[in-house]
Amino acid sequence: MRIFEQLESQVRSYIRSFPVIFERSKGAYLYDEQGKAYIDFFAGAGTLNYGHNHPKIIEAMIAYLQNDGILHGLDKATSAKKAFLQTLSETILEPRHMDYKVQFTGPTGTNAIESALKLARMVKGRSNVIAFTNAFHGLTMGSMAVTGNAFYRDEAFVNRANVSFMPFDGYFGEEVDTSLYLRRFLEDGSSGVDLPAAIILETIQAEGGVNVARDEWLRSVEKVCRDFDILLIVDEIQVGNGRTGRFFSFEESGIRPDIITLSKSIGGGLPLALVLLRPELDQWKPGEHTGTFRGNNLAFVAAKEALEYWSDSVLGEWVKHNSAILKEGLEALVQAFPELGMSARGRGLIYGLEIPLSGMAKEVSANCFQKGLVIELAGASDTVLKFLPPLIIEEETLREGLGIIKEAIGEVLREREARMGEVFGDR
């Protein structure tokens, strides 16, 4: 690990949580240089919904490269882009009666967010945007401004103007409908909240702690947008692409976003980001918003193969099947350790297990890694274990991972109890 410590910036993060050198990967497993296998409950922060090195995706990319397929094309027309757009339309958009234009941005999620915010402000002629508590939308200037976590929002490098924050669903508890707060602030001309160009939200706040918005809350927010002529931007970067069992996480709610941002698994494991926008919002002038790496052609090849999964209901049903197992397993963990005051929440194959004891989730994650399981943390104080396995994970592997977590919690709990009863310390 010395070369990384010598040459790589202090900003590195995951390498600190998982301090080994990984050499290869397959399906739901990572392997280090010594050949040790690790079950992956992180999936590249939601980039690897179809697993590591999916055979069908790899074969398509190899064939494309062997045929001297175009790798870099700016936004030129290419056969790879054509095939991707046709598959996206036929497999995702048309079956859902979704009439959207596709804008390719730079290859990361934050590029898509920046484009969406810029477009919304341009179309509406307003500068304000409303975001929500605990939101995470990226770490470039615009996306960071609509991100809630104070850790990222140092005033030295983020412009806090032109963004208003409102409480997300459940922020004050399930009994409080925070969409009423939103409506009241917009109705009151003296609230200090300017009429925004857009409201941006995640249906499930992944980085924010796996906070799940109720369908009725999402519909209420959409109604506010319609009543006040505000654009609704839904960030599907981490929780879309089938993560909840349907391709879009908002489908069950029945809402119709004006703008949708996609990245991570939309590229089949490769860098790709795009914005879906209603046709009447496509008011860009040619070349008004560009990027050297918009439209990654090799990612188009991978993405086309990944989208084929959604030509039938098989993968969605598999996610539903494993979701029930995951939910049941987490509820069993909560019951097995009542003294910890844990709680579980989520949908599909994104779940969070909150461990309120300060620092314990981090200790459990580290213990899991020693036992051969990669799992990351979420929430403002890193108190949530975030379950984000590949959608294609086998049931046996999922259950094995849950077993490792149970062992890890038990070991960490016993260690804390041995240290002067820390389990009863600060929560």
UniProtKB/Swiss-Prot annotation:
Record's keyword annotation contains Transport: no
Family listed: Belongs to the class-III pyridoxal-phosphate-dependent aminotransferase family.
Pathway field: Amine and polyamine biosynthesis; ectoine biosynthesis; L-ectoine from L-aspartate 4-semialdehyde: step 1/3
Organism: Wolinella succinogenes (strain ATCC 29543 / DSM 1740 / CCUG 13145 / JCM 31913 / LMG 7466 / NCTC 11488 / FDC 602W) (Vibrio succinogenes)
Highest taxon listed in the record's lineage: Bacteria
Coiled-coil features, chain-numbered ranges: none
UniProt KW Ligase keyword: no
Gene Ontology biological process: ectoine biosynthetic process
Name of the protein this chain belongs to: Diaminobutyrate--2-oxoglutarate transaminase
Keywords: Aminotransferase, Pyridoxal phosphate, Transferase
